């Protein structure tokens, strides 16, 4: 009897201790009256940092030195009321507040605001509308946040920490037209209909030298795909600023990279305006969505007909306003990473509308290699498993193969920033682009965000609609004549995100294509990281700044082999 009572006492003691730990210290958040202008929906983020190098909201990443974030949804936050962040908030890299070690931290809260969309199909969703920043929760104008304070945090402490939201992120000024760079913004009829509210597309246009003095010339269109551009990048009409304070880029281990960028931008200006540079219109597109900083330039169940809107609404309007040739043979695409995937995808899905795709380090173009996951054969995205072993799948490496993040960790970070694919980050946007829409109006998960279990029905949908390697092979009898000679792929064999793996199997498939043969180009950079683009003569940190001059020249030399007979191949080469 005595022994039994002792056991019961010990069990109760353990449960009490566990219960105390599961409570953790709580945070109560209120909004300054002047900022609480309406009832808010959104994601409330609580951020911790053990240093004061920058605000905590700028220190969350996939890197080993990431700081900490916890998130919870807020629905209809009424003015004058408070929100409590406690143990149920989901976090990264610690999942729960009770797991965060006691210590001194700089603490901050951010409210990432959501808006309500009534979709064409009758679904209603709450999402963060892009506000000119390119879908960054820590930079989005209108988001509100607290001034960081230093506290001593102890998960065993029952004291309530008060946090006051007293700051708002200001609007971002619109870019200004100049002699060479112009800007355009249109309301898309297709996207407005899908989203149930006005939706816009924009672009930055770099005009060729002599545009005004050659009023009768019409120009080819060079389309640089990539992440959200605040303005046309890498073009500078004045020499580098001699007083510019040099920065340090840890990735490249280079001091003064900002000076290198300015010098490269100035050199590009001199080449662009000098003799022997092909005279084309070069554009960078703004197509941020409520899910990400761009749409991936294709039609999607969750994001709408961005492919059609860009190809049939935006591009013709640009060509109309700025004297583009306006025919598929005179358009080509290039880009890296997300832009690399987009460059290839639009060429495949619109084979007659574009005449060349130069895709560097593309996002996964074969879902047998969805980074380090095979969505068709693997059962779990986070772990390779056997009867006696479980191995975490790597997600981020350097050129030596040293791993700094796993697939699970990256997705844990995304889930802390937002559920229902609302983090504005990488794996979430792939689901927003590639997945069917769920019954709740949000993208269906390719894998469970908590466990990593892969949904094979979603994988089958991905394969038939967005696996570019599979689609090219499947549709080659129909589109081969329109694609031959147009596909160019480049990737480093030590890409940080393992994107080279998909290119390997894509290359194997392309080599086997017949009637016609592909006549494609695939090239690899030895020990090159993300995002190597085909230049064997320069280090990655230089070549990544030279997309325009590299691929505009390359296309201008190749176009004569793919252009229809009788078209104008000379007037724009003045």
Model regions and ranges:
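Bacterial Sec-dependent N-terminal signal peptides
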Residues: 1-27
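Short, charged low-complexity linear motifs
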Residues: 13, 31-34, 292-298
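Contiguous beta-strand segments within globular domains
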Residues: 25-31, 37-44, 198-204, 223
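Residue-level hotspots within well-ordered secondary structure
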Residues: 41-43, 47-51, 55
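Non-catalytic cap/lid and distal C-terminal segments of serine-dependent acyl enzymes
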Residues: 50-52, 58-574
